């Protein structure tokens, strides 16, 4: 995935360069980041404070704020209010090329708390950006971490502690090296009563055989009552027997393990044991929860979206539907017991793990407010379930999908499709007629390439000849998730539209093919313990041009009452991919999510040009864009404080995506 995104950066840059020769320029952009903050508009003393207490704004993941000072009439007056720099751009770390800055800060009274990729935690003044304290988790710089990112922290108040007592208010952060750390929110010092030294080692709760090489915690923990819950990332496609994907729950005061849950049934008494062959369940790994969790405090539920069983592209060592992998699971917060589970992908062969935070919403139907959970997916489909029972809100059909032609593989014959809303990305089979290019030469090359590959639409299994994955394993949707406007009953989703080519390689040929030089800029993975290795890259020509027409990234609004797409527009230009002072409005790949405000606006960065944008939520019209000092591959947040509304985003770039690097947190507010 990492190399594929870097390649996507190069190829879209090439599109921009060649776009000089006859392709329409969307707009000219001469602005550059200069670091100068604007003269602020006068504060409005009567403006109430509006907070952002947790990642995504609320425990249910709505990415919505009731702040309204900035609205459709005045958004063009937004300008930088303050800039904070962390000093971290990954230098000195072996995994610097994977460095990202994906954090979304949280607001507690007048302090913003956030984390960096290498697990430095900062507390800064929310009105000025002045630093209050910092903490360094001391991450070892030498290992090759599977992903270098951290999307945030969580805050908790101990109601039993006396006022002013150290660690009455705590900030929790998960780390790249599989630790959960508790910090005093006032000082940034470790809470030593938490597990004795202020941290717990997640792997200590697992058997040695289930620990795997890495357990990076990339999403923020959640708190429900006095329980801290978190999942973890995992290395992909290295081998079949990887670490066991686990959700952990700890006592927020003491660090004592309260429960742990995993999707793959090591225990024969597990509710899904009958769906697995015992010997395969014993050696299959992952099905981890690396995406953000959601919490329903009133119901005492934690919602977890699980990933793929290992490895991603060959399932002959894990026959069956692999129940609870690739599933939305509702867990009892007190016990970790399953309340309900809905599998979204059966027997995943495409790395279609569930990457996004489940979003809790109430949808009006026939005058009745129905509590639901909405799940965006890499397949570009939105699945919606009743929060109490897991019953589909929109009906789900099991539709036949293509069979595998690979020896030993048994692809599941059907896959779930919601009848509404329609998919936000194409699912159809690709033919030679779909080939796209900037010239007849590369278009003809793409035509021949498509004709040589297997393509029968979404869920076409991997093959030895090569299969077109549509959409690719980056999505559809990814970890940025969706935004939810409760009043409008509208979901906002940004999606990628970029097919990939996946080919299996017989084990005896893997090293020869990998080292042949015939497949430049291709990701190779061994999938040890199976008969096949893997190669994967975007569907492009040898000119590094896309073989599919734009847009390659979009932003959409979906009416969740009727299950209809209201609007869908390209998101992102090629402005920062070629060194030229303009960009083509083709839409680009992106990572990050939307922010919705009561001012009728959708804010989003995410894509491969260095801008934060504001859209009209009702029409999809772009109303404003603000230049960033580096790539904005993070989800913005907002708050009203001291009579002003601030819109804040981390701008540090994304090493794998290829955007410009930095260490900035930028706050925008209305200027004069």
What function would you assign to each model-found segment?
Residues 76-89, 121-143, 157-162, 180-212, ...:
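Extracytoplasmic/lumenal domain signature
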Residues 66-75, 80-113, 138, 465-474:
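Asp/Glu-centered strand-loop micro-motifs enriched in Gly/Pro and often flanked by an aromatic residue
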Residues 1-17:
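N-terminal Sec-pathway targeting helices
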Residues 50-52, 60, 86-88, 108, ...:
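Acidic, proline/glycine-rich low-complexity intrinsically disordered segments
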Residues 23-70, 413-440, 447, 519:
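N-terminal pre-domain segments of enzymes
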Residues 59-66, 88-93, 122, 312-313, ...:
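Short, solvent-exposed loop/turn elements at domain surfaces
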